[in-house]
Curated annotation (Swiss-Prot):
Molecular-function GO term, any one: transmembrane transporter activity
An example Gene Ontology CC term for this record: plasma membrane
Membrane-crossing segments per the record: 1-20, 22-42, 64-84, 88-108
Intracellular or extracellular location(s): Cell membrane
Keywords from the UniProt entry: Cell membrane, Membrane, Transmembrane, Transmembrane helix, Transport
Organism, as annotated: Lactococcus lactis subsp. cremoris (Streptococcus cremoris)
Topology of the protein relative to the lipid bilayer: Multi-pass membrane protein
The UniProt record lists the keyword Isomerase: no
Key word Transferase present: no
Record PANTHER family: MULTIDRUG RESISTANCE PROTEIN MDTG
Name used for this protein in its record: Multi-drug resistance efflux pump PmrA homolog
Similarity comment text for this entry: Belongs to the major facilitator superfamily.
Length: 119
C-alpha cells in the first residue's frame, strides 16, 4: 500500500507542472499503475485483518467509500479548479495523498518488516 501511495504521489505532483496535453496524458496513464497497485492491496489487507463475520460488511463499506470518493473528488476538484486553478486542484490532491501516506505509515508501521500481516 505504501509503495502504491508513494508512486501515486510521485506521479500526481508533476501533473501540476505539465506544459502540454501529451505530458498530462502520459502521467495519467502512469497513474493507472498506482491505482492498479492500491486496490488489490487494500482488498487483500481488508480480508486479512477483518474477522470472518465482518468481511462482507467491511467490503460493503470500502465499496461505498470508494464510490463516494469517485463522486466527491471530481466535484471538489472541479470547484477548486474553477475558483483557483487546475494546478491548485492537482497540488491539493497531492497533499491529500501525502496525508494518506503518513496515516498509512503510522497505522501499519508494525507490519513493515514482516513478510505477512498474519505473522
Amino acid at each position: 500500500i505504501l509503495i502504491g501511495l508513494v508512486f501515486t504521489f510521485v506521479i500526481y505532483l508533476p501533473m501540476a507542472f505539465v506544459q502540454s496535453p501529451l505530458q498530462l496524458g502520459i502521467l495519467r496513464f502512469l497513474l493507472g499503475f498506482g491505482a492498479g497497485a492500491l486496490m488489490p492491496s487494500v482488498n487483500s489487507l481488508l480480508s486479512k485483518i477483518t474477522p470472518k463475520e465482518g468481511v462482507s460488511r467491511i467490503f460493503a463499506y470500502a465499496q461505498m467509500c470508494s464510490n463516494l470518493g469517485m463522486v466527491t473528488g471530481p466535484l471538489v476538484g472541479s470547484a477548486i479548479a474553477g475558483y483557483i486553478s487546475y494546478r491548485a486542484a492537482i497540488v491539493g490532491t497531492s497533499l491529500f495523498v501525502i496525508v494518506n501516506i503518513i496515516w498509512s505509515f503510522i497505522n501499519f508501521r508494525k507490519y513493515l518488516r514482516k513478510r505477512s500481516i498474519m505473522e
